[in-house]
C-alpha cells in the first residue's frame, strides 16, 4: 500500500510540474480559440458577399457614437450604419446608479421589464429598505443583522481570509439554498434596511425589546413614540400606526397606477391611460370613504371628516364607471380588490407588533416582571441563569423573524400590491455580442485589414 501511495505522489508531482509549465500558456490559447469560434458561429449567419456583409442588432443609444468610431477605424469609412425607430422586441438593459443597482437582483428574479416599461428598480431600492427597517424597528436586532450582513459581504468577497467561526454544516446548508454570490447580493440589499431599522428602533425606543430607560436604569430616555405604563409605544399607538400603513398603501397603489398610465401612454393607448386614472379615483374614493365612516374613533388621525362623505362617494362612483367604460364589464369584478391591496400594507404594522410583543413578554417574564410578580432574574442564581437563557433564545428567535418576515413581506408588498398595477415583465435581457478577455487582448485592426484593403 505504501509503495502505491508513493507512486501516486510521484504522478501528482509530475502532473503539477507539467501544469506549472504549460497551464499559463494554454489559458490564453484556449481563450482566443473560444473567441474566434464564437465569431465564426455568428459570421456563418450573416448576409454576405465577396466584398461586403450585413449585420443587424441592438445597441444602447448612448453607445452609438462609440460604434461609429469603431466602424470608421475598422473599415476606413467604408460602411453604412442605418438606425431604426422600431422598438418592438427590443431587449432590456437596466441602467441604475451604483447604490441602487444592487436591487436589480430582485427585479431580475421577479421578471425583467420590457424595454418600453418603467424600470421599477429605483422605487424598489427606496421603498424596500423603508419597509424592512419599519418592520424590524429595533436598534439591537437591526445592529446585529447589519453586522452579520457586513461580515458576509467581506467574507464571501475574501474566501481565502482564513478559517471562519460558522459551523460547516450550517455553511453547507445555506450555500445549498442560496449560492454565495446571491447571498452576498442579499446581504448588500439588507444593509440599508438595517440602518433604517436602527433609526426606527431609536424612534420606538426599542433595544432588543428593552427601552433605553430600562437598560440605563432610568438615567437616559429618548423616544418619539412614548410608552405607557411600561407598554411599548408601538402597542399603545397601534391605531395610528395602522392608519399610517393604510396611507402608505394608498400612496404605493397610486404610484403603481401612475406608472401604469405612463406605460400605456408610451404605447399610445389613451383609453387605458384614462383607465388607470379612473382606477386612482376608485382607490382614493373607496379608501377615504371607508376611513370617513370610522372617523369618530378617538385613536385615529389624518382622517377626513364625514362632511366630505359625498365627495368621496362621487370619486368612487366616477372612478368605477370610468373603469368599466375603458376596460370593460369584467373589470367591475376587480373593483373590490383595490381596497384589499391598500389594506395589505397593514401587514407592516402586524410584523412589527409580532416582534415587539414577543420581546416584551419574554423580557417581562425573565427580567422586568409582571403585575403578578417580579422577573425570574430576581429569584436566585438558578432562575437568573434561566432568565438569561430565555432572553437569549427570545432574541435569537426575533432576529430570525427579523430577517425572514420583513424580507419576505417587504418584497411581497412590492411584487404583488405595487407591481401588479403597471408591470408586464417578461423582458429579454440585452446580451451584447462580445467576449470577456482575461488573458488576451483584441486585435481589431489586424482582424479587419481585408475590409480596408
Predicted regions located by residue number:
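Intrinsically disordered, flexible peripheral segments
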Residues: 1-94, 98, 449-452
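Conserved, carboxylate-rich catalytic/transport cores that coordinate ions
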Residues: 65-453
Amino acid at each position: 500500500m505504501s509503495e502505491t501511495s508513493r507512486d501516486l505522489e510521484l504522478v501528482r508531482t509530475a502532473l503539477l510540474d507539467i501544469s506549472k509549465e504549460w497551464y499559463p500558456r494554454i489559458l490564453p490559447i484556449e481563450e482566443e480559440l473560444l473567441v474566434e469560434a464564437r465569431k465564426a458561429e455568428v459570421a456563418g449567419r450573416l448576409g454576405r458577399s465577396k466584398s461586403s456583409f450585413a449585420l443587424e442588432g441592438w445597441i444602447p443609444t448612448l453607445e452609438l457614437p462609440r460604434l461609429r468610431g469603431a466602424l470608421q477605424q475598422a473599415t476606413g469609412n467604408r460602411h453604412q450604419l442605418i438606425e431604426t425607430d422600431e422598438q418592438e422586441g427590443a431587449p432590456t438593459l437596466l441602467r441604475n446608479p451604483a447604490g441602487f443597482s444592487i436591487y436589480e437582483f430582485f427585479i431580475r428574479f421577479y421578471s425583467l421589464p420590457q424595454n418600453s416599461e418603467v424600470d421599477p428598480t429605483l422605487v424598489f431600492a427606496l421603498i424596500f429598505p423603508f419597509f424592512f427597517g419599519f418592520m424590524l424597528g429595533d436598534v439591537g436586532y437591526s445592529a446585529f443583522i447589519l453586522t452579520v450582513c457586513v461580515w458576509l459581504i467581506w467574507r464571501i468577497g475574501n474566501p481565502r481570509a482564513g478559517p471562519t467561526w460558522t459551523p460547516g454544516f450550517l455553511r453547507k446548508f445555506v450555500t445549498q439554498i442560496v449560492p454565495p454570490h446571491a447571498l452576498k447580493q442579499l446581504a448588500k440589499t439588507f444593509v440599508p434596511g438595517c440602518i433604517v431599522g436602527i433609526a426606527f428602533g431609536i424612534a420606538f425606543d426599542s433595544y432588543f425589546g428593552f427601552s433605553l430607560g430600562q437598560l440605563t436604569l432610568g438615567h437616559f430616555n429618548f423616544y418619539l413614540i412614548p410608552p405607557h405604563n411600561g407598554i411599548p409605544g408601538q402597542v399603545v399607538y397601534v391605531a395610528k400606526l395602522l392608519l399610517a400603513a393604510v396611507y402608505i398603501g394608498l400612496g404605493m397603489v397610486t404610484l403603481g397606477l401612475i406608472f401604469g398610465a405612463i406605460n400605456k401612454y408610451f404605447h399610445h393607448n389613451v383609453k387605458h391611460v384614462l383607465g388607470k386614472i379612473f382606477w386612482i379615483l376608485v382607490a382614493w374614493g373607496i379608501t377615504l370613504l371607508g376611513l370617513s365612516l370610522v372617523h369618530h374613533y378617538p385613536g385615529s388621525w389624518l382622517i377626513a371628516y364625514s362632511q366630505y362623505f359625498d365627495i368621496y362617494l362621487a370619486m368612487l362612483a366616477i372612478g368605477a364607471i370610468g373603469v368599466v367604460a375603458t376596460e370593460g364589464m369584467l373589470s367591475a369584478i376587480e373593483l373590490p380588490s383595490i381596497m384589499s391591496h391598500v389594506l395589505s400594507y397593514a401587514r407592516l404594522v402586524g410584523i412589527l407588533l409580532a416582534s415587539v410583543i414577543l420581546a416584551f413578554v419574554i423580557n417581562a417574564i425573565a427580567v422586568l416582571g409582571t403585575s403578578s410578580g417580579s422577573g425570574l432574574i430576581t429569584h436566585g442564581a438558578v432562575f437568573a441563569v434561566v432568565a438569561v437563557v430565555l432572553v437569549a433564545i427570545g432574541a435569537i428567535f426575533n432576529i430570525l423573524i427579523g430577517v425572514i418576515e420583513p424580507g419576505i413581506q417587504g418584497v411581497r408588498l412590492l411584487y404583488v400590491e405595487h407591481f401588479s398595477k403597471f408591470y408586464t415583465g417578461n423582458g429579454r435581457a440585452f446580451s451584447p455580442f462580445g467576449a470577456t478577455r482575461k488573458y488576451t487582448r483584441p486585435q481589431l485592426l489586424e482582424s479587419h485589414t481585408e475590409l480596408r484593403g
